[in-house]
A protein has these predicted regions:
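Regulatory and interdomain segments flanking nucleotide-handling catalytic cores
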Residues: 1-374
């Protein structure tokens, strides 16, 4: 007898809401799409993939997967196949983390002895505690999706504890730096000013290297990094640092991660958002828009046949690609993610900075978004 399986996953830490740069947003989207791609391309001979469609493109891969396992395909039990897919998912995330960590260690090797790197333990914790993986199973698609939703109610997650200062972006989780796992430290006697000095130097060096400056310590003290990837005054936790680094072409290539076409052609034009708590700071006002399919789950159930669902998934992904490409050509902003039944975009002034160019042309944005796009 055939079994239907529904799979999804979600970040425990929000990958989107605290982002100040386009690089954060693109990095988060790339990671989500890549992890879904890992699930649906692992041992495909064990199941029939129903959704998502359009596997030749990694961009905009939704994090909801529908599978069908026929009885003649079941050399392993359905539960064993699910466990194997989950292991592949987690191993891919471990590989992403390890690649980013090793790149930083190699880049900063001239400045720190190997014995000074005390941060591997924290990276190991984030291997297991970043994502929640959910699945449901049933004799038909509807029962599998209901089972998935029921299982999502029983969450089993543990946070990562930390001491010291936290991320300057989210305000949560430890700052990633080479000494974050130092042992035998007394919190009462620790010289916090000295630690902050080490952290500041670590991020200054890393920011300059990511900007392409080969001699960070040779730069004048009053010179600040350009901040293509990291601003010199930013302090990131491990997931946030990973989001930035996965957009580095060398790391993306080594992982086989597909960067969006417009970024390969035009590069990043990073957008600095003005923090809400400091309206006088550098940056510009931005607007956000998002869309979510109205009762798409119910629509999928009504479609009935597996082939109709496959066709619908493919059409939705094709629509998302065209929607993203068309909006990005308007120079009103960027579509960060468009796949499946949802999308996220940002609007801003593409001419910023400039005299009297701080406003967003909301009339044009609304007119474009309200125009039907097929």
């Amino acid at each position: 007898m055939s079994k239907y399986i529904a799979i999804t996953f979600s970040p425990v830490q929000s990958f989107i809401e605290k982002s100040r740069k386009l690089r954060d947003l693109y990095g988060a989207s790339q990671i989500l799409s890549d992890l879904t791609s890992t699930i649906v391309t692992h041992r495909p001979e064990q199941y029939h993939l129903i959704s998502p469609g359009l596997l030749n493109s990694q961009q905009g891969m939704p994090n909801r997967v529908l599978l069908k396992i026929d009885s003649e395909m079941q050399s392993s039990s359905s539960e064993e196949i699910i466990a194997e897919l989950q292991r592949a998912f987690l191993n891919r995330w471990k590989n992403i983390l390890a690649t980013c960590r090793k790149w930083v260690e190699n880049a900063l090797a001239p400045y720190y002895r190997s014995s000074e790197w005390n941060w591997q333990k924290s990276w190991k914790k984030w291997e297991k505690r970043t994502w929640e993986f959910f699945w449901g199973m049933g004799d038909n698609l509807e029962s599998a999706m209901v089972d998935l939703e029921n299982r999502k109610l029983a969450r089993n997650w543990q946070g990562v504890n930390w001491v010291g200062e936290s991320s300057s972006l989210s305000g949560t989780d430890a700052i990633a730096w080479y000494g974050m796992d130092r042992e035998n430290q007394d919190m009462k006697t620790l010289d916090w000013s000295e630690e902050n000095r080490h952290i500041a130097l670590f991020y200054r060096r890393l920011a300059f290297l990511l900007d392409g400056v080969n001699d960070p310590d040779g730069q004048p003290k009053d010179r600040q990094p350009e901040g293509k990837y990291i601003d010199g005054n930013e302090r990131l936790n491990i997931p946030e640092l990973t989001k930035r680094l996965i957009t580095l072409p060398h790391i993306a290539r080594s992982l086989g991660v597909e960067l969006p076409e417009e970024l390969r052609q035009r590069g990043f034009r990073d957008l600095i958002r003005r923090p809400q708590d400091n309206p006088a700071s550098v940056g510009q006002k931005t607007g956000w828009f998002m869309g979510d399919g109205d009762k798409v789950g119910d629509y999928l159930k009504d479609l009935g046949s597996d082939q109709k669902i496959r066709d619908f998934s493919k059409i939705m992904r094709q629509w998302g690609q065209k929607f993203q490409r068309d909006f990005n050509q308007t120079e009103l902003g960027r579509i960060i993610y468009a796949g499946g039944d949802d999308f996220l975009g940002i609007v801003y002034n593409s001419q910023f900075p400039g005299p009297q160019l701080n406003s967003i042309d909301l009339d044009r944005v609304l007119h474009w978004l309200q125009t039907p796009h097929k």
